[in-house]
Amino acid sequence: MADRLKNVLQQGIYLLAAHPNWRESRVNRELLSAARAAPGVTVQDLYGRYPDYDIDVAAEQANAAAARLIVLLHPIHWYAMPALQKLWIDEVLTHGWAYGAGGDALRGKDLWLVATTGGPESSYSPQGYNSHSFEAFLPPYRQTAALCGMHFRPPLLLYGAHTVSQQAIAAHVRNFEKLLESHPHWPARENLDAYPGYAVPDGDRPYGSGSGSGSRGS
């Protein structure tokens, strides 16, 4: 037991939870509670911590740099992450820190998406009303990880969060807890190749080397 606890405490997991209304949450609220109870996990409730959207960039960078695994926990809103989670990425993952020349603070770390959808799994198919599999909506997450030299780990999803049974939610939470506890010893972790990184010219950052992600235009 002592050895297992020591292993968990050394994991260095930073979990970013983003939900605009926790009172209406059926699944993410349970996952948040489980993460808060897990040893070795630092939890940041973004909407609770930054209700005015004024993110403490230095503190967030310190937390992210100290972690081996960064978890993005949120519902999918219009095929993407909630607004405050996107703002966190824009402001915290700066050029020269997270990517670009000298930007290696996150290199080699894992990025893990833990997400819920309102629609059932059947809706995420060419025949469903979302027209695509969920995989089709993952490129922004994957490329964010790649640009920062991180490993994007297979997402943990729960479809149909509004209607799924309590038994299914409980099983999902248990699986989430086991995965948190077992990191970094996840299947195939040792087979991951290091990302080569990307040389982003300073001139491509119109706001200077301290600006956020490459998705930000003029």
Where would I find each of the regions flagged by the language model?
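Short, solvent-exposed amphipathic alpha-helices that sit
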Residues: 26-37, 133-148
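Generic recognition of short, well-ordered alpha-helical segments
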Residues: 26-30, 55, 83-87, 167
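N-terminal beta-loop-helix "entrance" segment that forms/cooperates
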Residues: 41-65
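Glycine-rich phosphate/pyrophosphate-binding loop and the adjoining helix
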Residues: 142-218
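Short, conserved loop/helix-junction motifs that constitute active-site signature segments
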Residues: 8-9, 103-108, 148
